[in-house]
Amino acid sequence: MHTGQRDMIRIRVSKEAFNAGFRAKHFGEVLYAQVKNEFEAVVDKCQVKIYTNPEDCTKIRHEIAIPVFDKRDERLSTMTDESVPVYYSCIMCQAFSPSHVCVVTPERLGLCGAVSWLDAKATHQLDPNGPCQVITKEKVIDERIGEYEDVNEAVRKLSQGALDDVSLYSIMEKPMTSCGCFECICGIEPFSNGVCIANREYAGMTPLGMTFSELASMTGGGVQTPGFMGHGKHFIASKKFMKAEGGVARIVWMPKELKEQVAEKLNETAKELYGIDNFTDMIGDETIAEDPETLVAFLTEKGHPALGMDPMM
């Protein structure tokens, strides 16, 4: 099995598979076959090269892969949900979460982090009958939470009737469902009137009293869980992140590594929306607090805006 995306994938190979003869070269053979199968409309030939030397992998990651990722993200950063005529659905994960449907917009990528609006558009163009379908956005029900009649109809159909309605910008009102592939999980932290975010790589405790794995067990499965949602890392700095509840100003805690990864863009968003400089300095992490009492004391000292916002519950 594998989880994650881009340069953060994790692949597990069972001892049984290894004992049966599975080796690194077989990854290449599988990739080769899948690329030819998935992209047969545009790919005639392909070559797979596997690097196992950590130094080579690190060099290639920084010199080739990350610049490509950054270029894609830069293109997306110029787009907004309002600037495009359609959104896209993604049901790639329905094999193990039958009722889950991702609604992918320019400002909210798929919760796995691997499917942006541009990716979903390309997927649909390559395979019009595939996992990514066009969703119109003409009939607005509630602009505040990002609810559309068109989106509800699509989700109802694609979830086989398991879901009736969904919002794009709220964690409390009709939140989008999660499968199990999410990069991050966001959960309400009532003592601080904000939310904590944990990423898949973080194995420690959160101020919510749960680890990532424990949060995942109650958030996934294609069921709406108000107060909790799975999402991609890039959604954290989005102006649409929990827009209905006040936006990124609700973020009170996340692991230090994740905070460093999103700091630049999150600080830019907070500055633009609220006029706050260096917002991430106000956000707690595991080196500061792993319990709500210590976290609230830190937030009070920093003057975190969430403490003065309307109650979420």
Map each language-model feature to its residues.
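Cysteine-centered metal-binding/redox modules
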Residues: 1-313
